[in-house]
Each structure stands twice: as C-alpha cells, then as structure tokens.
Amino acid sequence: MYNQQTYPSFTHNPALMPDGSGQYNLGTYTGMARHPHQAQAFFPFSGVKSDYGDLGGQTTSVGDTSAWNPLTSLDSANQLGISGQGNPFKNLKREREDDEEKSESPEPKCSPPSLPPAYYTHAWNPTTTFWSQVSSSGTTVVSKPLPTPLQPGDKCDPVEANKIFTSSPDKSGESGISSLDNSRCSSATSSSSGGTNVGTPRSLSRGASDGLSSDSEEEAPNSGEMEQFAKDLKHKRITMGYTQADVGYALGVLFGKTFSQTTICRFESLQLSFKNMCKLKPLLRSWLHEVENNENLQEIISRGQIIPQVQKRKHRTSIENNVKCTLENYFMQCSKPSAQEIAQIARELNMEKDVVRVWFCNRRQKGKRQVYPYIRENGGEPYDAPQTLTPPSQGPFPLPQVMPSQVFPTVPLGANPTIYVPTYHKNDMFPQAMHHGIGMGNQGN
C-alpha cells in the first residue's frame, strides 16, 4: 500500500557488544519485529572497573549465555525436575509404580473388593440454598464425609477393607438426621424439665419414682390420702376406746416421743401443716398396728405413773376467806410488794410464793377495772372520800343561777312586751291586723 524506503546498512559502534545468545532479540517475539533491521538489539556495556578490584564472574562471554525465561515461576517441568516430552504426571505415576514393585514388604497386599460405583439419589443443585432445604423438608441434612476408597496398591487389613462401604450414602445421611434429631430432642427435654422443676417439683418427683418401692410413695402422700388416713385413725381410736391423750402417751411409750392431746386432735381435724402431718403419719400407723396386734398395750398405757411423761394441768387454787382478808390488808398497805415481802407474806400465811405473787397481780388488775380509785401505788396513802363538786357560782367567774333547787326546772319568764295598736278607721273595708294575744271582741258589730 505504501512504499517503504530502504535504509542503509547500519554499522556497529565499537562501544556496543552484540547479543550472541539472542536473549534480547526482538525478532524472537512475534509481532514485535516489524522491520528487518530491528531483528538485533544492542545495549551499551560499561567498561568501568570496580573500586574493589576485578569481580569474577561478572563479565559475560558469548559462550556462557543462557536462554532467558521471563516466566520461570510457572515452569512446572523445571520445578518438578522432570525433563522430557509428554505428560509429566504420567511419568511420575510410572516411576512410583516402579518403586513399589522394587520394594519388598513382608505384609501381604490386598485389594479392596469390587464394589458398585457410588450412587446418589439427589443431584446437587448449586442454586438451592441451605435455608430453602430446611424450610421445605423441615429437617437439616447433616453431610457426613465418605471414606476414601483404597488404591489397588495400598496396604490394608482385609476385614477393615470390607467395612469401608458397608452403608450407603443415603443411610449415612439418615443416621446424621436421626442423630441431630436426637440431640435436638434431648436438649429440648432438658430445657423443659429445667423450667418445670421450679413450679411442680412434687409432681415430677412422683412421676419419676413410679418404678420405686411403695415406701417412697408413703413418704410423700397427697392430701386425699392424708385426709382418709385421719378419718380412719379417728374411727379406729373411738372404736377401740382410746382417747387422744392415750394415743399421745402411747406414742411416747413406743417411740420415746410423747405428743399432747392437742396435737392428736389437730391431726385428726387436719389443722396441722402438711409437712408435720407427713412426719406424724408413720408413727400413728405403727401405733394402729401395735394396737391391733398387741392386747397388752392398754395395760402399758394405764400404768402412767411409771414414767410421767404427760404433764398434767395444774388444779385451780382456792383461798379461804380469812386468808383473803389478810391479803386485802396487805394490799391496802402496799399494792405492789417486792420479792422479799412476797416471800415473807407466803411464810406467814403458809402459802406458796407463786400463789401470793399471782394474787397480788390479779388484785391490781381488778382495782384498775373498778369505778373509784384505790390505794396509791407509790406511797400507800388512800384517796379521800368521793370528791364533791363545787357549784360554778363559787368560782372566780360566777354564773347566774338559772336552775333552782326544785326537782323540775322552770324557765323564768319576763314581762310581756308592749303592744302598739294603730288608730282604727271605721270606714276601712279590711279589718285591722291584730296581735295574736289579743281577743277579737264582738265581730258582729
């Protein structure tokens, strides 16, 4: 298309050294050498000597040149140390087989049994996400790594080789799902049990102890069983002729711990706490068993004087009249005697100190309830006779005597007020209004 001019031959400069190896020859790179004169490139070479002398090996001769490879890091053949043409990996495999054939081993060699190829029912879909599978199926498939099949030349145990592919991939997936479900159920059960234990420990303990012995059931009865036992106890006790006090004393004789009549009464009427009733129920059941089987138990109970464990109530104290008069005289002198004075009064009257002390306490409470005050507690001086009320006229501001000495009071009346009557006109049509206290006279005139 265009006529290109021919350039004259280019002469080399003596300071330039040609590249004999063709390392930097632009003509070797396709598409870069457009003209024939660009087939050889020259580079300036410095002839300056180093300050430290001749550096051996730095001067390059034409015979020592080597090919320059800009991509040496990607040269797999040089890195692996493989020389030759063909596939290098096949050569490696052949060398490995030759080495294994040369090496002799005392262990027997075995090959895995011929197995059918692995078959997977579900094809892998890269577009399907994890959560879409979970939402569609409801369960998460746990992928389980498959065992690596053995090579023909590997050493193995014949028994172990037969156990490699015993289960199919589908079964392994199912086992993974079942294990995940089991762990999920176990964690949910543990969390739910931990939450319900706080609210109903008794029901759970009873439910968990269904397989235990009957003794554990008796230790924690419910309210219905306790109520029925209390009714049976009361019925049998009355039928056999025992009192509640006899039952309490019999428990002391049998088990070394005496209960009062009030405790047995509260148990029969279900007025004790549930915890105390649970503690008392085994003892009462043992007592019923002893009463039904031992006929001499009534004789043992009737001998209450052997070990007086039941404290009897103290009888009411009665004081004679002459002793009461003497105590009244002491009370008039001092309403609150000291401990020494109480002991002296008890010796004089031949009484107990507690009886004298209680009498003085009761007498003081009785005096507080009376209308008139009694002897002063501080000095023992009696009050004067009932005080007479002074009339109000004798005070500093006397009031007028309104109420006379008669039995029925009378209201003093003053003079009648003056009545003013206006002049009477005879020709008036309307009568003159008159006071209420004045008579009307003859109305006919």
Swiss-Prot record:
One Pfam assignment: Homeodomain
Single biological process term from Gene Ontology: gastrulation
SMART domains: HOX (SM00389), POU (SM00352)
Region span, Disordered: 76-116, 139-227
KW DNA-binding (keyword) present: yes
GO molecular function per UniProt: DNA-binding transcription factor activity, RNA polymerase II-specific; DNA-binding transcription factor binding; RNA polymerase II cis-regulatory region sequence-specific DNA binding; sequence-specific DNA binding
Compositional bias per record (Low complexity), positions renumbered to this chain: 183-200
Keywords: DNA-binding, Homeobox, Nucleus
GO cellular component: nucleus; transcription regulator complex
Subcellular location(s) per record: Nucleus
Signal peptide annotation: none
Domain POU-specific intervals: 218-292
Main location: nucleus
Reported tissue expression: Initially (stage 9) expressed in all regions of the embryo, becoming localized to the ventroposterior regions by early neurula stages. In adults, expressed at a low level in the brain.
InterPro entries attached to this UniProt entry: HD (IPR001356), Homeobox_CS (IPR017970), Homeodomain-like_sf (IPR009057), Lambda_DNA-bd_dom_sf (IPR010982), POU (IPR013847), POU_dom (IPR000327), POU_domain_TF (IPR050255)
Domain of life: Eukaryota
Compositional bias segments (type: Polar residues): 76-88, 164-182
Function: Transcription factor that binds to the octamer motif (5'-ATTTGCAT-3'). Antagonizes the activity of nodal/activin signaling during gastrulation to suppress mesendoderm formation.
Family as reported in the entry's similarity comment: Belongs to the POU transcription factor family. Class-5 subfamily.
The protein, known as: POU domain, class 5, transcription factor 1.2
Highest classification ranks of the organism: Eukaryota, Metazoa, Chordata, Craniata, Vertebrata
Gene (name only): pou5f1.2
